[in-house]
Amino acid sequence: MDEIFRMAREEAIAVLGINDFFVTHGYESFYKQSLKNRIFPLFNIEFTGLMKSEKANGTRINDPNNPGRIYFSGKGLDYPFNPGFLNRIKLNSVIRESQSQMKAMITKLNKLITDVNPSLKLSYDEIRNDFAREMVRERHLAKAVRVLAEKKYSDPGERNQFLAKLYGENKTVTGNGDHAQLENEIRSNLLKSGGRAFVEENEAAFLDIGRIIKIILNSGGIPCYPVLLDDAKGRFTEFESDPSKLHKALTELRVG
């Protein structure tokens, strides 16, 4: 976090925000750094929700691959974060479900990994300690796979061969040399829907959109809908394809 604030000072940034899915574990250290560096802190949070009627009729919202799934943000929350007792219980329940999914994906990853090299194995606790603060997410799993491959195979050719065997179906490794690109490739081949280590999320891992908005408002924040609009090929999701209907839907959700 020191580097983030150093860069902010160098670029004369007056306001700096922090954001993560479901959790606010970084708020305290972020707040202390903001005071130390005299930069105004903006506390934010992000949620993954589920709109069941949209899922049932196949309507994609702002996740282009999963009908009914909605990404939703809260901006400018109070510090300390206090969503209320019942909302905190619900948040903790969602986090537990999310981590159960991550553990199941690690189990599937380990099956793939040990089939290639029985001496290698991933651990949920190690991934959380090494790559995450509290909550393990898909990106942390991808990073763990990359780091595991790099530590075991110093030769790029052997490393690529190892990863290609994990991918299966005669797929090749194209993201080598760029950590972010390689981790995205690992996510696409192993962790996304259709991937060899994919585990579908339980509906209990999602909050209802009404609950999400209530948590944000109770925490002093502003409910915000992050608009996807289109992808690289210029295609819109069904939810966002008509601006008037999009405006109406967001207004009904008390957004804007």
Which role fits each region the language model picked out?
Residues 80-165:
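Non-catalytic, alpha-helical, charged scaffold/linker segments
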Residues 23, 28-31, 49-51, 57, ...:
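Generic marker of "main functional regions" within proteins
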Residues 154-198, 206:
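Long, low-complexity, polar/charged, intrinsically disordered or flexibly structured peripheral segments
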Residues 28-35, 136-148, 168-183, 204-214:
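Short, charge-rich amphipathic segments
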Residues 52, 105-106, 111-113, 179-189:
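Short flexible/disordered coil segments
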Residues 8-11, 15, 83-86, 90, ...:
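Generic alpha-helix detector with strongest preference for long hydrophobic helices that associate
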Residues 1-69, 77, 185-220, 225-256:
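An N-terminally biased module of ancient metal coordination in phosphate/nucleic-acid-related enzymes
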